[in-house]
Amino acid sequence: MHRSFCTGFPANLTGKGYRDGKGVTGGETMRSFHSLNRRGGWHARRKGNGMGTTLHGVNVDQLVGTVNAIKENPDLARFRFRAVTEWVDGGHSRTKIQGFYGAGVEDASRNSPFLLEGDEPPVLLGANAGPNAVETVLSALASCLTVGIVYNAAARDIKVESLSFTLEGDIDLHGFLGLSDRVRPGYQNIRLGCRMKSDAPREKLEELWEYVQRTSPVLDIVRNPVPVSLTIENA
């Protein structure tokens, strides 16, 4: 029997997030970004014969190998991601993303950069050349949670037939336009709903969902302040 599991949660932008676990990022064998919790991660739930088990397009053996490599050499967990953004015209900007540092080396797996277009809709004086920045935040949040669910479901031998997210965020432009010091410029709240179809027991899906929330890098970024250093120079 397939179960449709649907839930949602508000992103608490000012509250305390998960701090009693240890979040780390990927290893050389995976070259992808994921999280490990010291109270029980992928290594604790591995099932298979060690011959390259794949579930949801995820090589579970490589996943477990990444975790074990990080346990043996914690420096492999240190990643640094980069982006370069240039103004095009009006509210239109173009971001290039390619290289990054991770697993102790500069990654060169991407032959060409990803190009992300950013703009505003006409009502905000843009030309719809791309989603605006705050919409991209919603996309990043859902993308990160997708990785967390799919990877951890594979490690727990939970089969996922379908997975989707719906997101909404509320902004009051009084903050962005400098019309009120009492209104924050960013999202006042975010609502996210997750719908997942799986034949796993509901309690297993709820346990997976709670774990992914605790270990999601982007959800942590949204819920908790991140130190940001800003510099500007004359070009």
Show which residues each predicted segment covers.
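Short hydrophobic targeting helices and cationic amphipathic motifs
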Residues: 10-13
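Extended beta-strand/beta-hairpin segments
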Residues: 31-36, 43-139, 149-235
